């Protein structure tokens, strides 16, 4: 089945860069999803740019193309990893390879899990560990 690439502006500076999976029929291996599912990822364009989450491993090329289109020639400053379920995190290593200057933002537990998921990935000098209640200012957007 042909994959359909999705790209849409949510606001002038928040862009949906996720992908739709019409092949999957079970979410989490147990819940029927007869129309497939979306793997959500967003790009925030501000003084600093942030990519929110990655997508399922089977959609690396489509997702990276969507991110590049959303960035429109800019380089991402941050990859925000909200949690390590594979449909949100499978392409962290691909992102780091594509954008080696970007900083990966996550909490302590998430970084510990990343080591298990991606044992060869080197984040030395490229990670920002956040704690509950901390904020990250991108410009007019502040992530908490």
Annotate each language-model stretch with its function.
Residues 7-67:
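Conserved beta-strand hairpin/beta-sheet module of binuclear metal-dependent hydrolase folds
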Residues 49-50, 78, 141:
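Structural motif
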Residues 26, 91-92, 115-116:
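Short glycine-/acidic-enriched loop or helix-start segments at secondary-structure transitions
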Residues 1-7:
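Short, Lys/Arg-enriched N-terminal segments with co-localized hydrophobic residues
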Residues 58-105:
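Active-site metal-binding motif and surrounding structural segment of the metallo-beta-lactamase
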Residues 9-12, 106-144:
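Metallo-beta-lactamase
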